[in-house]
Amino acid sequence: MLSSKLSYNYMMIAPHHLATKTGSDILKEGGNVVEAMIASAAMISVVYPHMNSMGGDNFWLISDKNKNIHAIDSCGPASNNINIDFYKKLGFNSIPSRGPLSALTVPGAVAGWKLAYDFSVKNLGGKIPISRLLFDAEQAAKEGIAVTKTLRNNLKSKLNQLVEVVGFKDIYLKNGKIPNVGDRLIIPKLSNTFSLLIKNGLQDFYSGDVFRKIISDLDILGSPLNLSLIHISEPTRPY
């Protein structure tokens, strides 16, 4: 029979034990729940990429010390230069489901981390530096993580859709094959991205070295997406 876990001080929950651990470690070091969630979300980008990553979005409901609820809707827009004629000129009758010409949107995840972090510093006494919050994820991507059954199953079920997507095979296949459970998965480029965010700040994703690298890759692939379109509103009271 299922039972509820109970805790007096704090509780950290994530779909992967390493994400749970890094969030718990931040709390033990005196961080607040927002800081713990940023660290945990960063780790999810490494260990749980089939569900969320820096290429995704995030949505926050944060309670302040007066129990007021503040919301962050960190969902990026689609490109502003895409319409039906864009696809017709390229010979498409429908929008591709995968690849650089699919219905991609500007990833809002990192922008959401920054807004939540700034809110934490201003309103919740946040004091853990971004360098610490991203460190565990950076190291995990650099040193490698064990492939889980869930990740392997998702790679298997989506292989036919993703195998021709540029970059997929280099990262997620081992000698051209899906890795086995327990195989070490090392993601150097993701580790380097975290390193740049640690060095230059989260905004680097949208206007710095990380931004320029992503835009260069998007241009090479022929994608019309532009990360400079990102504009996430400040935390607001939802009601």
Stretches with model-predicted labels:
Residues 230-239:
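Single conserved hydrophobic/aromatic residue that forms the stacking wall/gate
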Residues 1-169, 191-192, 198-202, 206-207, ...:
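Proteins synthesized as precursors that undergo proteolytic processing into mature forms
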Residues 4, 178, 228-231:
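Hydrophobic transmembrane signal anchors and adjacent membrane-proximal interface regions, especially
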Residues 169, 176-184:
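Glycine-centered loop/turn motifs
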